Curated annotation (Swiss-Prot):
Keywords: Cytoplasm, Phosphoprotein, RNA-binding, Transposable element. Capsid protein (CA) is the structural component of the virus-like particle (VLP), forming the shell that encapsulates the retrotransposons dimeric RNA genome. The particles are assembled from trimer-clustered units and there are holes in the capsid shells that allow for the diffusion of macromolecules. CA also has nucleocapsid-like chaperone activity, promoting primer tRNA(i)-Met annealing to the multipartite primer-binding site (PBS), dimerization of Ty1 RNA and initiation of reverse transcription. The modification Phosphoserine is found at S416. This is Transposon Ty1-JR1 Gag polyprotein. The record marks H401, N402 as: Cleavage. Residues 429-440 have a biased composition (Basic and acidic residues). The lineage of its organism: Eukaryota, Fungi, Dikarya, Ascomycota, Saccharomycotina. Residues 1-93, 126-173, 352-440 are annotated as: Disordered. The gene is TY1A-JR1. One of its GO terms (cellular component) is cytoplasm. GO terms for molecular function: RNA binding. Residues 1-16, 153-165, 402-418 have a biased composition (Low complexity).
Length: 440
């Protein structure tokens, strides 16, 4: 009876499993309470171990092993903190796994070893599921790109849709030198445009066409970090990343500003070398134009001294200003301000002389009326010619012959001379003269 009561009490307090063990131990004359207590302790240890295994299993898979990582770091060793990409601000697993990319599909598709300080960039999975790029991927910056030229299309015309018929988009080359960053960022912007991300690229005013999404920001950060190693970044880029390691948009905006500045510098140099001035425009406007160009070049690191500036200005002077080339050629220390004083003096003299001249311009109607009422009082000279020639007129040859004969025979009187001259003279077809024999 006592053993049956103990077995029932054991069954209620310790469960069916322990009750069966207790009933078995009754036949060996051992205390069933001691046995049940030991078995209960073993059950509790087993359950605690099982629970610990269940809780530790997801933790081990929280940071999956990266098949693309060349040399993964142990979890106990903290990654290095130097460089513009800090570990304490690393993106979460969800942020590092963007979806919906048509070309790369995901940053893990890029076949490059990630940074040692960022082991969470690439998700797990077999590498065969990601499309591979041609052998041209990862070529140096000097290798020509299949896209012709570095001309950028308008960001406003870029399609923000993530679907495309292209099989792949060639990624930008690896940056290998800080001096190559201006050329590299052009190819990187071209890569973003080909990836249907032209709308997030800053425009001329520094603002993008549309707002960037979280997945696009992650893709932008990952690709920039992979293809632009931190040791090859210029100092100004490192300064931006030291403040905000994800501010890639600011880097792109500053890069575009520098591109425009380089273009402006070239235009300013060409304009300064081809100056032309002849007084047709105000001297103040000409001086403002030239000084603004010189100040811009000096601020951008292209120093233009007074000697070079004066030579360029004087070479473009023409008209009355041309003599300034010779009056000042001996003054080696002449400044731009002194040269413009002479230009202003000539311009003011020109304006004063033009204002002092009276204006006698008459109306066109008055001139027409005067021309109609004007009469010519002087009689024109009229030369009257006799249309009928007499047959007894002599030619010059006959007259000369008569004069010669009259000189040879002075005894002949005037009547005989006049009589001989009144007789007709006959000419043959050869224009020879035939006189009468008596006249010889």
């Amino acid at each position: 009876m006592e053993s049956q009561q103990l077995s029932q009490h054991s069954h209620i307090s310790h469960g069916s499993a322990c009750a069966s063990v207790t009933s078995k131990e009754v036949h060996t004359n051992q205390d069933p309470l001691d046995v049940s207590a030991s078995k209960t302790e073993e059950c509790e240890k087993a359950s605690t171990k099982a629970n610990s295994q269940q809780t530790t299993t997801p933790a081990s898979s929280a940071v999956p092993e990266n098949p693309h990582h060349a040399s993964p770091q142990p979890a106990s060793v903290p990654p290095p903190q130097n460089g513009p990409y800090p570990q304490q601000c690393m993106m979460t697993q969800n942020q590092a796994n963007p979806s919906g990319w048509s070309f790369y599909g995901h940053p893990s598709m890029i076949p490059y070893t990630p940074y040692q300080m960022s082991p969470m960039y690439f998700p797990p999975g077999p590498q065969s599921q990601f499309p591979q790029y041609p052998s041209s991927v990862g070529t140096p910056l000097s290798t020509p790109s299949p896209e012709s030229g570095n001309t950028f299309t308008d960001s406003s015309s870029a399609d923000s849709d993530m679907t495309s018929t292209k099989k792949y988009v060639r990624p930008p080359p690896m940056l290998t030198s800080p001096n190559d960053f201006p050329n590299w960022v052009k190819t990187y912007i071209k890569f973003l445009q080909n990836s249907n991300l032209g709308g997030i690229i800053p425009t001329v005013n520094g603002k993008p066409v549309r707002q960037i999404t979280d997945d696009e920001l992650t893709f932008l950060y990952n690709t920039f970090q992979i293809f632009a190693p931190s040791q090859f970044l210029p100092t100004w880029v490192k300064d931006i990343l030291s403040v905000d390691y994800t501010d890639i948009m600011k880097i792109l905006s500053k890069s575009i500003e520098k591109m425009q500045s380089d273009t402006q510098e070239a235009n300013d140099i060409v304009t300064l070398a081809n100056l032309q001035y002849n007084g047709s425009t105000p001297a103040d406007a000409f001086e403002t134009k030239v000084t603004n160009i010189i100040d811009r070049l000096n601020n951008n690191g292209i120093h233009i001294n007074n000697k070079v500036a004066c030579q360029l200005i004087m070479r473009g002077l023409s008209g009355e200003y041309k003599f300034l080339r010779y009056t000042r050629h001996r003054h080696l220390n002449m400044t731009v301000a002194e040269l413009f004083l002479d230009i202003h003096a000539i311009y003011e003299e020109q304006q004063g002389s033009r204002n002092s001249k009276p204006n006698y311009r008459r109306n066109l109607s008055d001139e027409k009326n005067d021309s109609r009422s004007y009469t010519n009082t002087t009689k024109p000279k009229v030369i009257a010619r006799n249309p009928q020639k007499t047959n007894n007129s002599k030619s010059k040859t006959a007259r000369a012959h008569n004069v010669s004969t009259s000189n040879n025979s002075p005894s002949t009187d005037n009547d005989s001379i006049s009589k001989s001259t009144t007789e007709p003279i006959q000419l043959n077809n050869k224009h020879d003269l035939h006189l009468r024999p008596g006249t010889y």
